């Protein structure tokens, strides 16, 4: 019953974040300017970004390219090559398929959330942060540290939004500087 309530709240959280629109001050986002909407899918946008090659390989290995080419919308908090390398886990090969999928689900939330949406939700939350449920059924907490947006997973793993987001036809790619799952 508790799980049903949690899933019932997920669309409400998405709508509360998505309702922010583009009204928030984009200057608040630091170096994360919003790029123009693209006709590319999330999978193509990730594939075109040079610093997300490792993530693209994890997506292929997990067999989730089709999901990120589908309807969506989703927001992918995309760890850069250096972040995935620092995690120290090789997620290639058939034996790592389940781990690859689990890692990806921990970095994807339903809905298309721009940096402005996230900043506006944090501001409405009074600076105490705002939470969003991932596709892995974990909670991510978004807060500000100075001008940076920090994401904290339930297990304590943290990452910051970095670089420019990419608005794709079926969601948003938000680059992050860390992995949102602690190494087991």
Residue ranges and their predicted role:
Residues 2-7, 15, 20-184:
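Mature, structured domains of secreted/extracytosolic soluble proteins
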Residues 12:
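Contiguous ligand/interfacial binding patches
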